């Protein structure tokens, strides 16, 4: 079974990949820093979830 993510996490991640897709990599730690740069997310949990979803989308582009 896969992970079910909340809609707002998917929306933020989709917009980030759409606008800054060439900047993100398959490295989760780098993506955490980039998510902090490009968004106003203050919470660590939400930031990590968005960064994880972005990492997954970059790693498996056919899932976008």
Swiss-Prot record:
Q: Please indicate if the UniProt record lists Cytoplasm as a keyword.
A: no
| A Pfam family matched in the record | Ribosomal_S17e
- What GO cellular component term, any one, is given? ribosome
Alphabetically sorted, this entry's keywords are:
Ribonucleoprotein, Ribosomal protein
What SUPFAM superfamilies does this protein's entry cite? Rps17e-like
What HAMAP family does the annotation carry?
Ribosomal_eS17
Protein family according to the UniProt entry: Belongs to the eukaryotic ribosomal protein eS17 family.
Protein name, entry field:
Small ribosomal subunit protein eS17
The species this protein belongs to is: Methanococcoides burtonii (strain DSM 6242 / NBRC 107633 / OCM 468 / ACE-M)
